[in-house]
Design a protein with these regions (language model features):
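Extreme N-terminal leader/targeting segments of oxidoreductases
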Residues: 2-69, 88
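Active-site/ligand-binding neighborhood in enzyme catalytic cores
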Residues: 205-326, 331-333
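N-terminal Rossmann-fold NAD(P) dinucleotide-binding loop
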Residues: 79
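Glycine-rich Rossmann-fold phosphate-binding loop(s) that bind the pyrophosphate
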Residues: 74-76
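Glycine-rich FAD pyrophosphate-binding loop
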Residues: 87-110
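Dinucleotide-binding Rossmann-like beta1-alpha1 core, especially the glycine-rich loop
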Residues: 114-202
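Mid-domain catalytic core of redox enzymes
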Residues: 320-434
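Conserved hydrophobic helix-helix packing surfaces used for dimerization/oligomerization
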Residues: 70-72, 94
Length: 434
């Protein structure tokens, strides 16, 4: 009985409060659990194919010999544009090799729950007068047309309104520049930056110091000076240190270059604005030409819409799932050893001309004897990692006060770049899954 007493004494007292608390836990256990998020799937770059090049101890012997007059390595936008250029020049035998299973590179798209979405680049700004080749192609595919001497864009493919908004101080505001009091120091600094951008856009010679493509603008000592200092340093020396302005300029650099204002050059930071739509402080109105150039083409699948139209003329001449292993320049030709992922065999291509439309660090690795210029350029270039995540929502997001849902939605202070609603271009009048 002694042991029995000891056991009885060891039992905890069960008060009413403890009973109520434990009952609550039991009832909570009976509540329906939130469904787990569906597992994520990786549909990006086929990294294991690239690792085949990195990890190979020796190159496999070719099982097949193939020939082409022109061989383009890489079917991203650069490779597709190069192939188009050769075709327009009358070269019929243009072949393309692409590591992925679809052309487009950083402009590929995807389908999620039956809805198209981008895997990378998702818009194209209306080209300026210097981008003649881009404008000509957009005319060819019907995105641009000439009316009474003016270039007019097909509004069906322009980003629908509202285009962008920013989340700041607990509410959404129109545009991407945080709203400020026009009489504040923030507004004064924004006007000062706007004036500086305008001066670079309209030099004494009457021409802009910046343009797209950049090589069509003459390089000079002033631009070289901008290129030797960071954008942040250039802003600091001019007293442009307002938190709202600096956040926006930093966001613009991260969005376009993958690096912050304290890393990119002042030339790059100013180029973002001066080569296109400029910078407009609160209360400043854009001119008619600037308003037109602020428009962007976009589609649910992003720039995959464009990539598909660039790739369409090549059809059977576009060889996807081909990993380039080696490029060797001979006296009379160039040989390219590639691994065909579908056939699981190595293939040797021989061409008169080879275009390396590849990232520089890959080009420097696959070329048998890379020239000094390629090695130096690859060593100097830094790459910034980035990730595009597509989420399927059963219904529209619960919205907060302020500006209505837009195509581009950015959060002040976030390390990310915001989110784009791929279904913003939908003509369905009733909001739904996105």
């Amino acid at each position: 009985m002694g042991q029995g007493d000891a056991l009885s004494d060891a039992r905890p007292s069960f008060t009413r409060r403890a009973f109520v608390a434990s009952s609550g836990l039991a009832l909570a256990g009976c509540a329906p659990q939130e469904p787990a998020l569906p597992p994520a799937a990786w549909v990006g770059a086929q990294h294991e194919r690239g690792h085949r090049l990195r990890g190979a101890q020796s190159l496999p012997p070719p099982a097949v010999q193939r020939r082409a007059r022109v061989l383009v390595l890489g079917a991203g936008i650069a490779g597709l544009a190069a192939a188009r250029g050769f075709a327009r020049a009358g070269v019929d035998d243009v072949q393309l090799l692409e590591l992925e299973d679809a052309a487009g590179g950083n402009s590929r798209g995807h389908t999620l729950a039956g809805m198209a979405c981008p895997l990378g680049a998702h818009y194209l700004p209306l080209p300026g007068p210097d981008a003649r080749e881009v404008g000509e192609w957009l005319h060819e595919i019907g995105l641009l047309k000439s009316e009474l001497g003016r270039t007019v864009a097909d509004e069906r493919h322009l980003c629908h309104s509202p285009q962008e908004r920013v989340f700041v101080d607990g509410a959404w505001a129109e545009g991407l520049l945080p709203p400020v009091d026009p009489a504040s120091e923030s507004a004064r600094q924004m006007r000062a930056f706007s004036k500086a951008v305008g001066e670079w856009q309209h030099s004494k010679s009457g021409t802009s110091a910046f343009g797209l493509p950049a090589h069509r603008v003459a390089w000079n000592a002033d631009l070289q000076d901008l290129n030797t200092q960071t954008f942040a340093y250039w802003l600091n020396t001019r007293g442009l240190n307002d938190a709202h302005l600096r956040w926006y300029l930093d966001y613009a650099c991260r969005d376009d270059y993958g690096a912050a204002a304290d890393t990119v050059s002042a030339w790059a930071g100013l180029h973002y604005f001066a080569s296109r739509h400029g910078f407009h402080a609160p209360g400043e109105a854009a001119g008619e030409g600037e308003r037109e150039r602020e428009g962007v083409f976009t589609w649910p699948e992003g720039n995959a819409w464009l990539a598909q139209r660039l790739a369409a003329p090549f059809k059977d001449r576009l060889h996807t799932g081909c990993t380039v292993l080696r490029v060797k320049e001979n006296r009379h030709n160039v040989q390219v050893l590639a691994w065909n992922e579908k056939a699981a065999q190595a293939e040797m291509w021989t061409a008169q001309t080879v275009v390396l439309a590849l990232p520089l660090f890959i080009a420097a690795r696959v070329v048998d004897t890379p020239p000094l210029a390629l090695r130096e350029a690859a060593a100097l270039l830094n790459y910034a990692p980035w990730l595009v995540a597509n989420l399927h929502l059963r219904e529209p997001l619960l919205d907060r006060p302020g500006a209505p849902p837009s195509w581009d939605n950015v959060i002040v202070g976030s390390q990310g770049l915001g989110y784009v609603d791929a279904m913003h271009q939908s003509l369905n009048p009733v909001p739904g899954a996105t």
